[in-house]
Amino acid sequence: MALRRAITKRLIDCYRSDVTQQHSFFRQLSPYNMKIHRQYMTSPNGPNLTDRIVGIRIESVSPPRREETPVMGLSVSETKKLLRLYQMEKVKERLREIPKSSVSYWEFIQICCESCGNDEQGSQMAKSLDHSGCVVVLGDIVFLHPHQIAKSMEAMIKQTSVLPNDPRKEELVQLATTKKSIDIEARRIVQAELYCGLGFLAVQTIGFMRLTFWELSWDVMEPICFFVTTIHFILGYIFFLRTSTEPSFEGLFRQRFKTKQKKLMERHGFDFLRYNELNSLFTTFPCKFHYPV
């Protein structure tokens, strides 16, 4: 019992000594803190900081200005311009859907009025399309494809500039006759080559059938047929690489026809540049001939 009392008394004394030391530490710090507080709150040359804070009128302090970002907008004239452009494109789209090359002026006005919404804007749109060259208005007829009119006028001007008894017409007739004979001969040669190819394939098929059912067996002919088919595919691939043409019967015919046509023209001394020049001069809608490559 005596030992327990001694230990308990010792613990109580230690606790009391710790609390006393803490209070003495804060007592030592408090005068220093008060001194710092007075130093910041008072000013030797004017009113102290407390009076300044109390004298501030909060309602007189204006809030910070907000930065307003400029808003990009369209003016009335720009809006009208965009609306007019939209209406014009809408009218052009309606005109492109018409399969005919020309319509009456009344139908043209109706299309413009339906696209624009009223008669006044439709009339203005029709005049704008006429002035811009999108259509050609001649009397009561409106031509929807001005480029065709331009080509026709160009051909007519060329024809009127040519004399009725121009000797170049005879030259064009001779060149056209020579070209026609060259085309006929080239076509005949190519058709003969294609018939030879058909005969070769028929003989090859008959030979493989005889070897399969009479001479040999399918076990022997199966790899042979596979390799022959592969060789045909390789030949078609080489044809495509050299000519950039699809390896079909039509592509083969066209390519062989161009090759034979070129050789025959060189043999007969045919001037294809002169032929194109005269053809465009004396023909209303010329079809230019391209030299075979």
Curated annotation (Swiss-Prot):
Motif annotated as Selectivity filter, chain positions: 218-226
Membrane-spanning residues: 189-209, 220-240
Molecular function GO labels: calcium channel activity; metal ion binding
Organism superkingdom: Eukaryota
InterPro entries assigned: MCU_C, MCU_fam
Extent of the transit peptide: 1-5
Membrane topology type: Multi-pass membrane protein
Coiled-coil regions listed: none
Residues that coordinate or bind Ca(2+): E222
Similarity comment text for this entry: Belongs to the MCU (TC 1.A.77) family.
Protein's name according to its UniProt entry: Calcium uniporter protein 5, mitochondrial
Originating species: Arabidopsis thaliana (Mouse-ear cress)
Gene name of the record: MCU5
